[in-house]
């Protein structure tokens, strides 16, 4: 899967994207757990997960060929 990082998470990880090889589908929760294990420095950061440009729930599945984006909260006025 391709993972896209934005804003603060992009700055912390010092990369805009990476490819992660999945052998099988994962739930969004499993993906987040994997990400936090790999990058503990983002464990307390808030973000929403979008899969193939659609926001998803933690129980939804991510397939090995999906594009996943970590979208930070948006503030505005």
From Swiss-Prot:
Post-translational modification: C-terminal thiocarboxylation occurs in 2 steps, it is first acyl-adenylated (-COAMP) by MoeB, then thiocarboxylated (-COSH) by IscS.
Superkingdom in the source lineage: Bacteria
Pfam family, one: ThiS
GO MF entries: nucleotide binding
Residues with the Glycyl adenylate modification: 77
Alphabetized Gene3D superfamilies for the sequence: 3.10.20.30
Pathway(s) served: Cofactor biosynthesis; molybdopterin biosynthesis
InterPro entries membership: Beta-grasp_dom_sf (IPR012675), MOCS2A (IPR044672), Mopterin_synth/thiamin_S_b (IPR016155), ThiS/MoaD-like (IPR003749)
Residues recorded as bearing 1-thioglycine in the entry: 77
Keywords: Molybdenum cofactor biosynthesis, Nucleotide-binding, Phosphoprotein
Gene Ontology biological process terms from the UniProt entry: Mo-molybdopterin cofactor biosynthetic process
Similarity annotation: Belongs to the MoaD family.
Function per UniProt: Involved in sulfur transfer in the conversion of molybdopterin precursor Z to molybdopterin.
Name of the protein in its database record: Molybdopterin synthase sulfur carrier subunit
Gene, per the UniProt record: moaD
């Amino acid at each position: 899967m391709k993972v896209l990082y934005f804003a603060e998470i992009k700055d912390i990880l010092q990369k805009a994207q990476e490819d992660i090889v999945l052998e099988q589908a994962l739930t969004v929760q499993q993906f987040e757990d994997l990400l936090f294990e790999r990058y503990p420095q983002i464990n307390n950061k808030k973000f929403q997960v979008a899969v193939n440009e659609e926001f998803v729930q933690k129980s939804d599945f991510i397939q090995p060929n999906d594009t996943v984006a970590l979208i930070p909260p948006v503030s505005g006025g």
